[in-house]
Amino acid sequence: MKHSHEEIRKIIPEMRRVQQIHFIGIGGAGMSGIAEILLNEGYQISGSDIADGVVTQRLAQAGAKIYIGHAEEHIEGASVVVVSSAIKDDNPELVTSKQKRIPVIQRAQMLAEIMRFRHGIAVAGTHGKTTTTAMISMIYTQAKLDPTFVNGGLVKSAGKNAHLGASRYLIAEADESDASFLHLQPMVSVVTNMEPDHMDTYEGDFEKMKATYVKFLHNLPFYGLAVMCADDPVLMELVPKVGRQVITYGFSEQADYRIEDYEQTGFQGHYTVICPNNERINVLLNVPGKHNALNATAALAVAKEEGIANEAILEALADFQGAGRRFDQLGEFIRPNGKVRLVDDYGHHPTEVGVTIKAAREGWGDKRIVMIFQPHRYSRTRDLFDDFVQVLSQVDALIMLDVYAAGEAPIVGADSKSLCRSIRNLGKVDPILVSDTSQLGDVLDQIIQDGDLILAQGAGSVSKISRGLAESWKN
């Protein structure tokens, strides 16, 4: 569904002078979703990225002008430039935009404009926000409310990470990594949990991070709703400071929407939610782990508070196939030593890695877990080094790839070799460092056994590597 420029004036009247919007770093998950929404609203979209891929190709097919690589001439004709937080200050397109006095804004500022004239539901938190955003989006879709959604990962049921709906509802993932979620002014805000991460943004001060989240929740109008996880002690510490209505969810006895009797059979979860009015709702999930039960209950709480019928909620949750790269099963493969299953997962923080391992253990019984782990950013590896050592020691076999730098300079003692050394010293697993990923398949064939679950874990290029491995194993 595309709109004419006359129709755009009715959708976002204040943006009527904007004709062309240029995205620097358009291939990123958050950037591409916003670009797709604006493209479907009828704006001319251009964008650049350092590499071509599925996302940039899809945008090009939809009508966006895509450039591979960055050059000053790419911003020609742009009314406004949207910049990813990954873009450096010396980027030629960014430099030229400022010289030409073209407005340059963060992606969250553009998302805020899209949200301004809609009923916004924003999902924040250190872990689980992509999955929770996807679940809420699918519930509203199942309820025939045709929401607009912008997610940080693929919504598998929809086959994309963004959709322009016809209704007033907008469901969006809120990014705390650069504190840009403070631009958003939603009607409902979900916070899944809070742990120290992206601490460079918060000057290494967790108290500053907490205060920023409270400020985010105070962007709600006085009649808005905050939905917070009762199992997270940091969030419960913040509740008295939130001057808005707060609804909680979780396994905790104090939760307004309380999870009881959780059981996992294979990779399927089922449990009961006790609602504030003591209504009991039986939930079936086809994604594993208690962390996904929490994500689903956050989505259920939002939907119930906004008056959506149980039938739509339960059907959407039962049909939910997961978000892209969240326990993404790539298939079963016959290898020289037997049959193995390969799973790709985005988790790159020790807590995320831990819950993925736990869900795999519960679903995979007494089978071995072989992990291919790619640390993401030197700064995160440094800040959470001891936590990584502990959690990565929980698997049966560990292959370590080099750190995915994400533009950072190396930090002494925060590389994969150092991580391997400390894990080996702990004595629970003997990691294998594989710097040349072309050797990964051969290394795996030497260590895997019949029935193994192979977890490819991390936020960098490990997904592409694991999918390449799956393709080669099919042949």
From Swiss-Prot:
GO BP terms, alphabetized: cell division; cell wall organization; peptidoglycan biosynthetic process; regulation of cell shape
Its EC number(s): 6.3.2.8
Residues binding ATP, per UniProt: G125, T126, H127, G128, K129, T130, T131
Enzyme class: ligase
Catalytic activity of the protein: UDP-N-acetyl-alpha-D-muramate + L-alanine + ATP = UDP-N-acetyl-alpha-D-muramoyl-L-alanine + ADP + phosphate + H(+)
A molecular-function term among this protein's GO annotations: UDP-N-acetylmuramate-L-alanine ligase activity
Protein keywords: ATP-binding, Cell cycle, Cell division, Cell shape, Cell wall biogenesis/degradation, Cytoplasm, Ligase, Nucleotide-binding, Peptidoglycan synthesis
Compartment(s) of residence: Cytoplasm
Primary role: Cell wall formation.
Statement: the UniProt record of this protein carries the keyword Nucleotide-binding: yes
Gene: murC
Species of the source: Haemophilus influenzae (strain ATCC 51907 / DSM 11121 / KW20 / Rd)
GO cellular component: cytoplasm
Pfam family, one: Mur_ligase_C
Pathway annotation: Cell wall biogenesis; peptidoglycan biosynthesis
Protein name (database record): UDP-N-acetylmuramate--L-alanine ligase
Entry similarity comment: Belongs to the MurCDEF family.
SUPFAM superfamilies in alphabetical order: MurCD N-terminal domain, MurD-like peptide ligases, catalytic domain, MurD-like peptide ligases, peptide-binding domain
